[in-house]
Design a protein with these regions (language model features):
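Solvent-exposed, acidic/flexible segments
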Residues: 95, 106, 110-121, 205, ...
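Substrate-recognition/specificity elements adjacent to catalytic centers across diverse enzyme folds
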Residues: 20-213, 220-226, 230-239, 326, ...
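Stable alpha-helical elements in mature extracytoplasmic
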Residues: 98, 102, 113-123, 212, ...
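Bacterial Sec-dependent N-terminal signal peptides
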Residues: 1-21
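Proteins synthesized as precursors that undergo proteolytic processing into mature forms
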Residues: 335-361, 368, 443-498
Length: 631
Protein backbone atom coordinates (compact mmCIF):
# COMPACT_ATOMS: atom_id res chain seq x y z
CA UNK A 1 0.00 0.00 0.00
CA UNK A 2 2.82 2.43 0.90
CA UNK A 3 4.52 1.67 -2.42
CA UNK A 4 1.26 2.31 -4.27
CA UNK A 5 0.67 5.60 -2.43
CA UNK A 6 4.27 6.64 -3.05
CA UNK A 7 3.88 5.89 -6.78
CA UNK A 8 0.67 7.91 -6.94
CA UNK A 9 2.36 10.82 -5.16
CA UNK A 10 5.27 10.74 -7.62
CA UNK A 11 2.84 10.61 -10.55
CA UNK A 12 0.82 13.53 -9.21
CA UNK A 13 4.00 15.49 -8.58
CA UNK A 14 5.11 14.85 -12.18
CA UNK A 15 1.70 15.90 -13.45
CA UNK A 16 1.73 19.09 -11.36
CA UNK A 17 5.25 19.91 -12.51
CA UNK A 18 4.29 19.36 -16.14
CA UNK A 19 1.19 21.51 -15.86
CA UNK A 20 2.84 24.30 -13.89
CA UNK A 21 5.60 24.57 -16.49
CA UNK A 22 3.10 24.37 -19.36
CA UNK A 23 4.70 21.15 -20.49
CA UNK A 24 2.67 18.04 -21.34
CA UNK A 25 2.92 14.95 -19.18
CA UNK A 26 4.50 12.22 -21.30
CA UNK A 27 4.36 8.65 -19.96
CA UNK A 28 6.25 6.63 -22.52
CA UNK A 29 5.06 3.35 -21.03
CA UNK A 30 1.46 4.37 -21.76
CA UNK A 31 2.08 4.93 -25.48
CA UNK A 32 1.48 2.07 -27.92
CA UNK A 33 2.61 2.06 -31.54
CA UNK A 34 1.11 -0.88 -33.43
CA UNK A 35 1.83 -1.28 -37.13
CA UNK A 36 -0.51 -3.13 -39.47
CA UNK A 37 0.57 -5.37 -42.34
CA UNK A 38 1.19 -2.32 -44.53
CA UNK A 39 3.38 -0.68 -41.90
CA UNK A 40 0.83 2.03 -41.09
CA UNK A 41 1.26 3.09 -37.43
CA UNK A 42 -1.77 2.95 -35.14
CA UNK A 43 -0.94 5.00 -32.08
CA UNK A 44 -2.79 4.75 -28.79
CA UNK A 45 -2.19 6.73 -25.59
CA UNK A 46 -4.19 8.29 -22.74
CA UNK A 47 -3.74 11.93 -23.83
CA UNK A 48 -3.50 13.81 -27.11
CA UNK A 49 0.08 15.05 -26.43
CA UNK A 50 1.15 11.47 -25.71
CA UNK A 51 -0.40 10.33 -29.00
CA UNK A 52 1.50 13.14 -30.76
CA UNK A 53 4.70 11.93 -29.05
CA UNK A 54 4.03 8.45 -30.44
CA UNK A 55 3.33 9.83 -33.90
CA UNK A 56 6.63 11.70 -33.89
CA UNK A 57 8.50 8.55 -32.89
CA UNK A 58 6.77 6.35 -35.49
CA UNK A 59 7.26 8.84 -38.30
CA UNK A 60 10.89 9.33 -37.31
CA UNK A 61 11.39 5.58 -37.60
CA UNK A 62 10.23 5.84 -41.21
CA UNK A 63 11.54 9.20 -42.45
CA UNK A 64 13.66 11.01 -39.88
CA UNK A 65 15.81 12.70 -42.52
CA UNK A 66 12.91 14.53 -44.17
CA UNK A 67 11.52 15.64 -40.81
CA UNK A 68 14.91 17.03 -39.85
CA UNK A 69 15.21 19.00 -43.09
CA UNK A 70 11.93 20.70 -42.18
CA UNK A 71 13.24 21.49 -38.71
CA UNK A 72 16.34 23.03 -40.26
CA UNK A 73 14.11 25.04 -42.59
CA UNK A 74 12.28 26.46 -39.57
CA UNK A 75 15.59 27.63 -38.14
CA UNK A 76 16.94 29.07 -41.39
CA UNK A 77 19.68 26.44 -41.24
CA UNK A 78 18.92 24.17 -44.19
CA UNK A 79 22.18 25.13 -45.92
CA UNK A 80 24.14 23.68 -43.01
CA UNK A 81 22.98 20.29 -44.28
CA UNK A 82 22.34 20.74 -48.01
CA UNK A 83 25.13 23.21 -48.65
CA UNK A 84 24.62 25.84 -51.34
CA UNK A 85 21.38 24.16 -52.50
CA UNK A 86 19.78 25.05 -49.18
CA UNK A 87 20.90 28.68 -49.13
CA UNK A 88 18.00 30.06 -51.24
CA UNK A 89 15.50 28.40 -48.89
CA UNK A 90 17.23 29.90 -45.85
CA UNK A 91 17.14 33.32 -47.49
CA UNK A 92 13.44 33.07 -48.36
CA UNK A 93 12.65 31.85 -44.85
CA UNK A 94 14.46 34.85 -43.42
CA UNK A 95 12.81 37.20 -45.89
CA UNK A 96 9.28 36.02 -45.05
CA UNK A 97 10.09 36.32 -41.34
CA UNK A 98 7.40 33.85 -40.28
CA UNK A 99 8.85 33.58 -36.80
CA UNK A 100 7.78 37.17 -36.12
CA UNK A 101 4.19 36.16 -36.88
CA UNK A 102 4.49 33.24 -34.48
CA UNK A 103 5.97 35.34 -31.68
CA UNK A 104 3.18 37.89 -32.07
CA UNK A 105 0.39 35.29 -31.98
CA UNK A 106 1.58 32.31 -29.96
CA UNK A 107 -0.02 33.48 -26.71
CA UNK A 108 -3.41 33.63 -28.42
CA UNK A 109 -3.27 30.04 -29.64
CA UNK A 110 -5.25 27.29 -27.91
CA UNK A 111 -3.19 26.00 -24.94
CA UNK A 112 -4.29 22.46 -25.85
CA UNK A 113 -2.69 22.84 -29.27
CA UNK A 114 0.52 24.09 -27.65
CA UNK A 115 0.62 21.00 -25.43
CA UNK A 116 -0.04 18.77 -28.43
CA UNK A 117 2.82 20.29 -30.41
CA UNK A 118 5.14 20.11 -27.41
CA UNK A 119 4.28 16.44 -27.06
CA UNK A 120 5.17 15.92 -30.71
CA UNK A 121 8.47 17.77 -30.37
CA UNK A 122 9.31 15.77 -27.26
CA UNK A 123 8.87 12.62 -29.34
CA UNK A 124 11.30 13.87 -31.96
CA UNK A 125 13.83 14.90 -29.31
CA UNK A 126 13.56 11.49 -27.65
CA UNK A 127 14.06 9.67 -30.93
CA UNK A 128 17.12 11.81 -31.66
CA UNK A 129 18.62 11.00 -28.26
CA UNK A 130 17.96 7.30 -28.81
CA UNK A 131 19.48 7.40 -32.31
CA UNK A 132 22.20 10.09 -32.32
CA UNK A 133 23.79 8.54 -35.41
CA UNK A 134 20.69 9.54 -37.41
CA UNK A 135 20.83 13.23 -36.49
CA UNK A 136 21.87 15.25 -39.55
CA UNK A 137 23.92 17.88 -37.75
CA UNK A 138 24.19 19.89 -34.55
CA UNK A 139 21.72 22.54 -35.76
CA UNK A 140 18.66 20.27 -35.76
CA UNK A 141 18.09 19.91 -32.02
CA UNK A 142 16.92 21.25 -29.70
CA UNK A 143 13.84 22.65 -31.42
CA UNK A 144 11.55 25.21 -29.83
CA UNK A 145 7.83 25.44 -30.43
CA UNK A 146 8.41 28.86 -31.99
CA UNK A 147 10.82 27.31 -34.51
CA UNK A 148 8.30 24.61 -35.28
CA UNK A 149 5.31 26.91 -35.77
CA UNK A 150 7.41 29.22 -37.94
CA UNK A 151 7.95 26.24 -40.24
CA UNK A 152 4.20 25.60 -40.52
CA UNK A 153 3.51 29.23 -41.45
CA UNK A 154 6.31 29.07 -44.02
CA UNK A 155 4.95 25.80 -45.46
CA UNK A 156 1.44 27.20 -45.94
CA UNK A 157 2.93 30.29 -47.62
CA UNK A 158 4.78 28.02 -50.04
CA UNK A 159 1.54 26.18 -50.80
CA UNK A 160 0.01 29.58 -51.55
CA UNK A 161 2.58 30.22 -54.27
CA UNK A 162 5.53 32.05 -52.74
CA UNK A 163 7.86 29.53 -54.36
CA UNK A 164 6.55 30.55 -57.80
CA UNK A 165 6.22 34.30 -57.23
CA UNK A 166 9.46 35.20 -55.48
CA UNK A 167 11.86 33.80 -58.11
CA UNK A 168 10.13 35.99 -60.71
CA UNK A 169 10.99 39.04 -58.61
CA UNK A 170 14.56 37.99 -57.93
CA UNK A 171 15.34 37.21 -61.58
CA UNK A 172 13.52 40.26 -62.89
CA UNK A 173 10.70 38.53 -64.79
CA UNK A 174 7.86 39.89 -62.66
CA UNK A 175 5.45 42.13 -64.60
CA UNK A 176 6.45 45.81 -64.30
CA UNK A 177 3.84 48.52 -63.99
CA UNK A 178 3.77 50.95 -66.90
CA UNK A 179 4.82 54.39 -65.81
CA UNK A 180 6.66 53.20 -62.68
CA UNK A 181 10.26 53.41 -63.76
CA UNK A 182 11.72 54.34 -60.40
CA UNK A 183 3.18 21.21 -58.59
CA UNK A 184 -3.84 18.69 -57.77
CA UNK A 185 -6.10 16.53 -56.08
CA UNK A 186 -9.54 14.92 -56.41
CA UNK A 187 -12.42 14.59 -53.98
CA UNK A 188 -15.98 13.31 -54.35
CA UNK A 189 -18.76 13.34 -51.74
CA UNK A 190 -21.87 11.22 -52.28
CA UNK A 191 -25.01 11.70 -50.20
CA UNK A 192 -26.90 8.69 -48.88
CA UNK A 193 -29.82 9.57 -51.18
CA UNK A 194 -27.52 9.07 -54.18
CA UNK A 195 -25.69 5.92 -52.99
CA UNK A 196 -26.95 2.40 -53.62
CA UNK A 197 -26.21 1.42 -50.01
CA UNK A 198 -27.88 4.43 -48.39
CA UNK A 199 -24.54 5.56 -46.95
CA UNK A 200 -22.69 8.82 -47.33
CA UNK A 201 -19.38 8.25 -49.12
CA UNK A 202 -16.23 10.34 -49.56
CA UNK A 203 -13.15 10.01 -51.74
CA UNK A 204 -9.97 11.55 -50.33
CA UNK A 205 -7.41 11.65 -53.13
CA UNK A 206 -4.38 13.90 -52.76
CA UNK A 207 -2.08 14.42 -55.73
CA UNK A 208 1.27 15.07 -54.11
CA UNK A 209 4.89 13.99 -54.53
CA UNK A 210 5.43 10.35 -53.62
CA UNK A 211 8.61 11.22 -51.71
CA UNK A 212 9.90 14.22 -49.78
CA UNK A 213 8.58 17.02 -47.61
CA UNK A 214 5.05 17.04 -49.05
CA UNK A 215 4.56 13.30 -49.48
CA UNK A 216 1.62 12.00 -47.47
CA UNK A 217 2.15 9.69 -44.50
CA UNK A 218 -0.77 7.63 -43.18
CA UNK A 219 -1.42 7.15 -39.49
CA UNK A 220 -4.22 6.27 -37.07
CA UNK A 221 -4.28 8.38 -33.90
CA UNK A 222 -6.39 7.54 -30.85
CA UNK A 223 -6.36 8.93 -27.33
CA UNK A 224 -8.60 8.39 -24.32
CA UNK A 225 -9.55 12.07 -24.58
CA UNK A 226 -11.70 11.52 -27.67
CA UNK A 227 -9.19 11.96 -30.48
CA UNK A 228 -9.69 9.13 -32.97
CA UNK A 229 -8.77 9.66 -36.61
CA UNK A 230 -7.17 7.88 -39.57
CA UNK A 231 -5.69 9.89 -42.40
CA UNK A 232 -2.75 11.57 -44.03
CA UNK A 233 -0.19 14.12 -42.87
CA UNK A 234 3.08 15.55 -44.14
CA UNK A 235 6.48 14.93 -42.54
CA UNK A 236 6.62 16.99 -39.37
CA UNK A 237 2.84 17.10 -38.99
CA UNK A 238 1.59 16.48 -35.41
CA UNK A 239 -1.97 15.63 -36.50
CA UNK A 240 -4.04 14.54 -39.48
CA UNK A 241 -4.47 17.03 -42.33
CA UNK A 242 -7.33 15.13 -43.92
CA UNK A 243 -8.92 11.81 -43.11
CA UNK A 244 -11.76 10.16 -41.23
CA UNK A 245 -13.02 9.86 -37.67
CA UNK A 246 -15.77 7.41 -36.60
CA UNK A 247 -18.32 10.16 -37.28
CA UNK A 248 -17.08 12.29 -40.16
CA UNK A 249 -14.44 12.70 -42.84
CA UNK A 250 -13.01 15.47 -44.97
CA UNK A 251 -10.66 15.92 -47.90
CA UNK A 252 -8.56 18.83 -49.06
CA UNK A 253 -7.79 19.87 -52.59
CA UNK A 254 -5.76 22.89 -53.63
CA UNK A 255 -7.83 25.86 -54.77
CA UNK A 256 -6.41 28.53 -57.01
CA UNK A 257 -7.84 31.83 -55.83
CA UNK A 258 -5.67 34.94 -55.83
CA UNK A 259 -3.68 34.35 -52.64
CA UNK A 260 -0.74 36.72 -53.22
CA UNK A 261 -0.65 40.38 -54.14
CA UNK A 262 2.50 41.93 -55.61
CA UNK A 263 3.26 45.64 -55.25
CA UNK A 264 5.87 47.67 -57.09
CA UNK A 265 7.31 50.31 -54.79
CA UNK A 266 8.03 53.83 -55.97
CA UNK A 267 11.67 54.69 -55.35
CA UNK A 268 14.24 57.09 -56.74
CA UNK A 269 17.94 57.85 -56.35
CA UNK A 270 17.27 61.02 -54.37
CA UNK A 271 15.57 59.06 -51.57
CA UNK A 272 17.89 56.12 -51.07
CA UNK A 273 16.47 53.47 -48.73
CA UNK A 274 12.97 54.93 -48.95
CA UNK A 275 9.76 54.40 -50.89
CA UNK A 276 6.87 56.76 -51.53
CA UNK A 277 3.29 56.10 -50.32
CA UNK A 278 0.52 58.70 -50.60
CA UNK A 279 3.10 61.42 -51.13
CA UNK A 280 5.12 60.47 -48.04
CA UNK A 281 8.59 58.94 -48.14
CA UNK A 282 8.82 55.93 -45.80
CA UNK A 283 11.92 54.07 -44.67
CA UNK A 284 12.37 50.69 -46.28
CA UNK A 285 13.07 48.31 -43.41
CA UNK A 286 16.26 46.30 -43.80
CA UNK A 287 17.40 43.11 -42.11
CA UNK A 288 20.66 41.31 -42.71
CA UNK A 289 20.12 37.56 -43.06
CA UNK A 290 23.14 35.46 -42.17
CA UNK A 291 23.26 32.14 -43.99
CA UNK A 292 25.58 29.40 -42.78
CA UNK A 293 26.52 27.12 -45.65
CA UNK A 294 28.05 23.69 -45.23
CA UNK A 295 31.68 23.76 -46.32
CA UNK A 296 32.07 27.53 -45.95
CA UNK A 297 33.72 28.56 -42.65
CA UNK A 298 31.99 31.93 -42.38
CA UNK A 299 28.35 33.03 -42.81
CA UNK A 300 27.15 34.69 -46.00
CA UNK A 301 25.01 37.80 -45.50
CA UNK A 302 22.17 38.87 -47.74
CA UNK A 303 19.82 41.81 -47.24
CA UNK A 304 16.08 41.36 -46.78
CA UNK A 305 13.64 44.23 -47.01
CA UNK A 306 10.15 44.94 -45.75
CA UNK A 307 7.55 47.59 -46.56
CA UNK A 308 4.08 48.31 -45.17
CA UNK A 309 2.81 45.81 -47.75
CA UNK A 310 5.03 42.95 -46.62
CA UNK A 311 8.30 41.16 -47.43
CA UNK A 312 10.16 43.00 -50.16
CA UNK A 313 12.78 41.88 -52.67
CA UNK A 314 15.03 43.76 -55.04
CA UNK A 315 15.26 42.89 -58.73
CA UNK A 316 18.54 42.85 -60.67
CA UNK A 317 17.50 46.22 -62.15
CA UNK A 318 17.19 47.76 -58.69
CA UNK A 319 13.39 47.84 -58.52
CA UNK A 320 11.61 46.82 -55.33
CA UNK A 321 8.56 44.57 -55.15
CA UNK A 322 6.59 43.65 -52.04
CA UNK A 323 4.48 40.55 -51.44
CA UNK A 324 1.35 40.59 -49.34
CA UNK A 325 -0.35 37.30 -48.53
CA UNK A 326 -2.68 36.22 -45.73
CA UNK A 327 -0.68 33.04 -45.16
CA UNK A 328 2.10 35.12 -43.57
CA UNK A 329 -0.31 36.80 -41.17
CA UNK A 330 -1.76 33.80 -39.36
CA UNK A 331 0.01 31.23 -37.18
CA UNK A 332 -3.18 29.29 -36.41
CA UNK A 333 -3.39 26.72 -39.22
CA UNK A 334 -2.58 23.81 -36.91
CA UNK A 335 -5.16 25.07 -34.41
CA UNK A 336 -7.90 24.85 -37.05
CA UNK A 337 -6.76 21.40 -38.17
CA UNK A 338 -6.73 20.23 -34.56
CA UNK A 339 -10.31 21.42 -34.08
CA UNK A 340 -11.29 19.63 -37.30
CA UNK A 341 -9.56 16.48 -36.01
CA UNK A 342 -11.54 16.66 -32.77
CA UNK A 343 -14.95 17.51 -34.27
CA UNK A 344 -17.66 14.90 -33.71
CA UNK A 345 -20.45 16.36 -35.87
CA UNK A 346 -21.11 18.87 -38.63
CA UNK A 347 -21.80 21.75 -36.26
CA UNK A 348 -18.45 21.30 -34.52
CA UNK A 349 -16.66 20.80 -37.83
CA UNK A 350 -18.10 23.93 -39.39
CA UNK A 351 -17.23 25.89 -36.24
CA UNK A 352 -13.65 24.68 -36.66
CA UNK A 353 -13.60 25.73 -40.32
CA UNK A 354 -15.01 29.13 -39.35
CA UNK A 355 -11.79 29.85 -37.44
CA UNK A 356 -10.49 30.68 -40.91
CA UNK A 357 -6.84 30.18 -40.05
CA UNK A 358 -6.15 28.17 -43.22
CA UNK A 359 -5.07 30.49 -46.00
CA UNK A 360 -6.29 28.10 -48.70
CA UNK A 361 -7.76 24.67 -49.57
CA UNK A 362 -11.06 23.33 -50.72
CA UNK A 363 -12.73 21.25 -48.01
CA UNK A 364 -15.04 18.38 -48.94
CA UNK A 365 -16.96 16.81 -46.05
CA UNK A 366 -19.23 13.83 -45.39
CA UNK A 367 -20.53 12.34 -42.15
CA UNK A 368 -22.64 9.46 -40.92
CA UNK A 369 -25.60 11.76 -40.21
CA UNK A 370 -26.57 12.46 -43.81
CA UNK A 371 -24.58 15.65 -44.40
CA UNK A 372 -22.24 16.35 -47.29
CA UNK A 373 -20.61 19.76 -47.57
CA UNK A 374 -18.10 21.57 -49.75
CA UNK A 375 -16.46 24.95 -49.33
CA UNK A 376 -13.75 26.71 -51.29
CA UNK A 377 -12.13 28.20 -48.24
CA UNK A 378 -9.23 30.52 -47.67
CA UNK A 379 -8.16 33.64 -45.91
CA UNK A 380 -9.42 36.14 -48.45
CA UNK A 381 -9.02 39.89 -47.90
CA UNK A 382 -11.45 42.67 -48.67
CA UNK A 383 -9.73 44.31 -51.64
CA UNK A 384 -10.42 47.78 -52.97
CA UNK A 385 -13.29 47.69 -55.50
CA UNK A 386 -11.68 50.35 -57.70
CA UNK A 387 -11.48 48.67 -61.12
CA UNK A 388 -8.27 50.51 -61.99
CA UNK A 389 -6.42 48.10 -59.69
CA UNK A 390 -5.61 44.78 -61.35
CA UNK A 391 -5.37 42.37 -58.44
CA UNK A 392 -4.21 39.47 -60.59
CA UNK A 393 -1.18 41.44 -61.75
CA UNK A 394 1.32 43.88 -60.27
CA UNK A 395 -0.25 46.59 -58.08
CA UNK A 396 0.94 50.13 -57.35
CA UNK A 397 2.83 50.21 -54.07
CA UNK A 398 2.53 53.96 -53.74
CA UNK A 399 -0.91 54.15 -52.11
CA UNK A 400 -2.67 52.72 -49.08
CA UNK A 401 -5.72 52.27 -51.30
CA UNK A 402 -4.23 48.90 -52.28
CA UNK A 403 -3.28 47.97 -48.71
CA UNK A 404 -5.93 45.59 -47.41
CA UNK A 405 -6.18 44.70 -43.71
CA UNK A 406 -9.48 42.84 -43.15
CA UNK A 407 -10.60 39.34 -44.09
CA UNK A 408 -13.87 37.80 -45.21
CA UNK A 409 -15.91 35.52 -42.94
CA UNK A 410 -16.93 31.97 -43.79
CA UNK A 411 -20.33 32.90 -45.22
CA UNK A 412 -18.73 34.84 -48.08
CA UNK A 413 -17.02 31.76 -49.56
CA UNK A 414 -18.60 29.49 -52.21
CA UNK A 415 -20.14 26.51 -50.40
CA UNK A 416 -22.76 23.78 -50.73
CA UNK A 417 -24.64 21.66 -48.19
CA UNK A 418 -26.65 18.59 -49.24
CA UNK A 419 -27.44 19.46 -52.87
CA UNK A 420 -30.48 17.68 -54.32
CA UNK A 421 -28.24 16.04 -56.91
CA UNK A 422 -26.70 14.00 -54.10
CA UNK A 423 -23.07 14.61 -54.98
CA UNK A 424 -20.27 17.17 -54.84
CA UNK A 425 -16.91 17.11 -56.62
CA UNK A 426 -13.71 19.08 -56.75
CA UNK A 427 -10.69 18.34 -58.91
CA UNK A 428 -8.88 21.68 -58.45
CA UNK A 429 -11.45 23.22 -60.79
CA UNK A 430 -14.16 25.84 -60.35
CA UNK A 431 -16.23 25.83 -57.14
CA UNK A 432 -19.08 26.98 -59.39
CA UNK A 433 -19.05 23.62 -61.21
CA UNK A 434 -19.30 21.36 -58.17
CA UNK A 435 -22.57 19.51 -58.69
CA UNK A 436 -25.57 19.28 -61.05
CA UNK A 437 -25.76 22.25 -63.40
CA UNK A 438 -29.08 23.43 -61.97
CA UNK A 439 -27.61 23.65 -58.46
CA UNK A 440 -24.22 25.18 -59.17
CA UNK A 441 -23.53 28.54 -57.58
CA UNK A 442 -23.41 31.62 -59.78
CA UNK A 443 -19.96 33.26 -59.80
CA UNK A 444 -21.66 36.62 -60.27
CA UNK A 445 -22.71 36.41 -56.63
CA UNK A 446 -19.09 36.34 -55.44
CA UNK A 447 -16.26 38.84 -55.46
CA UNK A 448 -14.35 38.53 -58.75
CA UNK A 449 -11.27 40.01 -57.05
CA UNK A 450 -10.94 36.73 -55.12
CA UNK A 451 -9.87 35.10 -58.38
CA UNK A 452 -11.87 31.88 -58.16
CA UNK A 453 -11.44 29.34 -60.93
CA UNK A 454 -14.23 29.46 -63.53
CA UNK A 455 -13.35 26.42 -65.64
CA UNK A 456 -13.54 22.65 -65.84
CA UNK A 457 -10.33 20.70 -66.20
CA UNK A 458 -10.04 17.24 -67.75
CA UNK A 459 -10.47 15.48 -64.42
CA UNK A 460 -13.60 17.36 -63.41
CA UNK A 461 -15.12 17.06 -66.90
CA UNK A 462 -14.45 13.30 -66.95
CA UNK A 463 -15.85 12.88 -63.42
CA UNK A 464 -19.05 14.65 -64.47
CA UNK A 465 -19.29 12.44 -67.56
CA UNK A 466 -19.04 9.34 -65.36
CA UNK A 467 -21.32 10.50 -62.53
CA UNK A 468 -24.19 12.22 -64.33
CA UNK A 469 -25.58 9.12 -66.10
CA UNK A 470 -25.79 7.21 -62.78
CA UNK A 471 -29.11 7.30 -60.97
CA UNK A 472 -27.34 5.85 -57.91
CA UNK A 473 -23.65 5.49 -57.13
CA UNK A 474 -22.28 2.30 -55.61
CA UNK A 475 -19.03 1.89 -53.72
CA UNK A 476 -17.68 -0.01 -56.74
CA UNK A 477 -18.73 2.88 -59.00
CA UNK A 478 -16.85 5.29 -56.78
CA UNK A 479 -13.65 3.27 -57.06
CA UNK A 480 -14.07 2.88 -60.82
CA UNK A 481 -14.47 6.64 -61.19
CA UNK A 482 -11.49 7.41 -58.99
CA UNK A 483 -9.13 5.05 -60.82
CA UNK A 484 -10.29 6.08 -64.29
CA UNK A 485 -7.43 6.81 -66.71
CA UNK A 486 -9.46 8.28 -69.55
CA UNK A 487 -9.29 11.86 -70.80
CA UNK A 488 -12.69 13.27 -71.81
CA UNK A 489 -13.87 12.97 -75.42
CA UNK A 490 -12.95 16.62 -75.95
CA UNK A 491 -9.60 17.25 -74.30
CA UNK A 492 -9.53 20.52 -72.38
CA UNK A 493 -6.58 22.88 -72.06
CA UNK A 494 -7.53 24.93 -68.98
CA UNK A 495 -4.12 25.94 -67.67
CA UNK A 496 -2.86 28.20 -70.44
CA UNK A 497 -1.73 27.16 -73.92
CA UNK A 498 -4.13 25.29 -76.21
CA UNK A 499 -2.55 22.28 -77.94
CA UNK A 500 -5.38 20.79 -80.01
CA UNK A 501 -3.36 21.73 -83.11
CA UNK A 502 -1.56 18.42 -82.53
CA UNK A 503 -4.71 16.62 -83.70
CA UNK A 504 -5.19 18.80 -86.81
CA UNK A 505 -1.96 18.16 -88.70
CA UNK A 506 -2.30 16.52 -92.13
CA UNK A 507 -0.19 13.37 -91.92
CA UNK A 508 0.04 13.13 -95.73
CA UNK A 509 2.28 16.21 -95.79
CA UNK A 510 4.81 14.69 -93.38
CA UNK A 511 5.57 11.07 -94.39
CA UNK A 512 8.25 10.53 -91.75
CA UNK A 513 6.01 11.77 -88.96
CA UNK A 514 2.86 10.18 -90.38
CA UNK A 515 2.80 7.12 -88.06
CA UNK A 516 2.90 9.37 -85.00
CA UNK A 517 0.24 11.76 -86.32
CA UNK A 518 -2.09 8.87 -87.24
CA UNK A 519 -1.56 7.17 -83.88
CA UNK A 520 -2.47 10.32 -81.98
CA UNK A 521 -5.54 10.99 -84.13
CA UNK A 522 -6.75 7.41 -83.62
CA UNK A 523 -6.01 7.42 -79.90
CA UNK A 524 -9.03 6.64 -77.69
CA UNK A 525 -7.83 9.06 -74.96
CA UNK A 526 -7.15 6.18 -72.58
CA UNK A 527 -3.85 6.49 -70.71
CA UNK A 528 -3.37 2.83 -69.89
CA UNK A 529 0.23 1.58 -69.97
CA UNK A 530 -0.28 -0.39 -73.22
CA UNK A 531 -1.25 2.67 -75.26
CA UNK A 532 1.00 4.11 -77.97
CA UNK A 533 -1.26 7.14 -78.45
CA UNK A 534 -0.98 7.92 -74.74
CA UNK A 535 2.81 7.82 -75.03
CA UNK A 536 2.77 10.33 -77.89
CA UNK A 537 0.43 12.67 -76.04
CA UNK A 538 2.47 12.31 -72.85
CA UNK A 539 5.72 13.28 -74.57
CA UNK A 540 3.96 16.24 -76.17
CA UNK A 541 2.52 17.25 -72.80
CA UNK A 542 5.99 17.80 -71.36
CA UNK A 543 7.59 19.24 -74.51
CA UNK A 544 5.00 21.83 -75.58
CA UNK A 545 5.42 24.12 -72.53
CA UNK A 546 9.09 24.48 -73.44
CA UNK A 547 8.19 25.56 -76.97
CA UNK A 548 5.51 27.96 -75.76
CA UNK A 549 7.38 29.46 -72.83
CA UNK A 550 6.29 33.04 -72.38
CA UNK A 551 3.16 32.52 -74.51
CA UNK A 552 0.67 31.28 -71.94
CA UNK A 553 -2.99 31.70 -72.96
CA UNK A 554 -1.95 31.23 -76.57
CA UNK A 555 -2.50 28.48 -79.14
CA UNK A 556 0.10 26.02 -80.41
CA UNK A 557 0.98 26.97 -83.97
CA UNK A 558 1.15 24.47 -86.83
CA UNK A 559 4.93 24.90 -86.97
CA UNK A 560 5.21 24.21 -83.25
CA UNK A 561 3.00 21.12 -83.56
CA UNK A 562 5.23 19.77 -86.33
CA UNK A 563 8.31 20.56 -84.22
CA UNK A 564 6.71 18.63 -81.35
CA UNK A 565 6.11 15.60 -83.56
CA UNK A 566 9.71 15.83 -84.76
CA UNK A 567 10.91 15.91 -81.16
CA UNK A 568 8.86 12.79 -80.35
CA UNK A 569 10.16 11.03 -83.46
CA UNK A 570 13.78 11.82 -82.60
CA UNK A 571 13.28 10.82 -78.95
CA UNK A 572 11.76 7.44 -79.80
CA UNK A 573 14.23 6.56 -82.55
CA UNK A 574 17.18 7.52 -80.37
CA UNK A 575 16.06 5.58 -77.32
CA UNK A 576 13.97 2.72 -78.77
CA UNK A 577 14.73 2.64 -82.52
CA UNK A 578 10.98 2.31 -83.23
CA UNK A 579 7.82 4.39 -82.98
CA UNK A 580 5.27 1.90 -81.61
CA UNK A 581 6.45 2.28 -78.01
CA UNK A 582 3.81 1.95 -75.29
CA UNK A 583 3.33 4.42 -72.46
CA UNK A 584 4.33 1.81 -69.86
CA UNK A 585 7.65 1.13 -71.57
CA UNK A 586 8.64 4.75 -71.15
CA UNK A 587 6.71 5.75 -68.00
CA UNK A 588 7.69 3.81 -64.88
CA UNK A 589 6.84 3.46 -61.23
CA UNK A 590 10.18 3.04 -59.47
CA UNK A 591 10.58 1.99 -55.85
CA UNK A 592 14.06 1.00 -54.79
CA UNK A 593 15.46 -1.40 -57.38
CA UNK A 594 12.01 -2.33 -58.70
CA UNK A 595 10.45 -0.74 -61.79
CA UNK A 596 6.96 -1.31 -63.20
CA UNK A 597 4.99 0.04 -66.19
CA UNK A 598 2.92 3.04 -65.07
CA UNK A 599 -0.24 4.28 -66.76
CA UNK A 600 -1.92 7.60 -66.14
CA UNK A 601 -1.14 11.23 -66.90
CA UNK A 602 -1.20 14.56 -65.04
CA UNK A 603 -4.83 15.55 -65.76
CA UNK A 604 -6.64 12.21 -65.61
CA UNK A 605 -8.46 11.09 -62.47
CA UNK A 606 -5.73 8.53 -61.77
CA UNK A 607 -3.15 11.28 -61.99
CA UNK A 608 0.54 10.64 -62.63
CA UNK A 609 3.27 13.24 -63.03
CA UNK A 610 6.76 12.23 -64.01
CA UNK A 611 10.36 13.35 -64.27
CA UNK A 612 13.20 12.19 -66.55
CA UNK A 613 14.65 8.84 -65.51
CA UNK A 614 17.65 7.16 -67.04
CA UNK A 615 17.94 6.93 -70.82
CA UNK A 616 14.66 7.57 -72.57
CA UNK A 617 12.33 6.98 -69.64
CA UNK A 618 10.33 8.97 -67.12
CA UNK A 619 9.41 7.91 -63.59
CA UNK A 620 6.45 8.88 -61.46
CA UNK A 621 7.33 11.53 -58.91
CA UNK A 622 3.87 12.86 -58.08
CA UNK A 623 0.19 12.07 -58.50
CA UNK A 624 -2.02 9.61 -56.65
CA UNK A 625 0.04 9.88 -53.48
CA UNK A 626 -2.77 9.24 -50.98
CA UNK A 627 -6.18 7.67 -51.54
CA UNK A 628 -8.81 6.98 -48.90
CA UNK A 629 -12.35 5.73 -49.54
CA UNK A 630 -14.74 6.44 -46.68
CA UNK A 631 -18.32 5.24 -46.19
Amino acid sequence: MRILLFSICILLQQFATAQSSNEPLIRVDKITIARDTYGVPHIFAPTDPEVAYGLAWAHAEDDFTTIQTLILTGKGKLATYLGAKGAPVDYVFGLLNTKATVLAQINSLDPKLILLVKGYLAGLEAFAKAHPEKVLNKNVFPITIEDYLATTVFSVAVFCGVDRTLPKILNGSIAHLKGMTGEGSNTIAVHSSKSTSGENMLVINAHQPIEGATAFYEAHLQSEEGWNILGGLFPGGPLIFHGTTPNLAWAHTVNLQDKIDIYQLETDKAHKGQYKVDGEWLALEKRKIKINIKGIPFPISKMAYSSIYGPTAKTPEGKYFSMRLPALMDAGALQQWYAMNRATNFTEFKTAVAQNHLAMFNIMYADKRDTIFYISSGKMPYRNADTSYHWNSTLPGDTRATLWTKFKPLNEFPQYTNPKSGYLINMNHSPFLATAESENLDPKNFDPKDGYELYHNNRSRRAKDLIDPLEKISYADLKRIKFDRQLPSTILFPYGFTADTMFLIDENKYPTLSPLIKALKNWDHNTNPESNGALIYNLAYYEIPKLMEGRKDDKLTTQEAIATYQYIYDFLMKNYNRLDVSLGEMQRLVRGDESWPQGGMPDVLAAVQTQPYGAGQRKMNSGDAYIEFVR
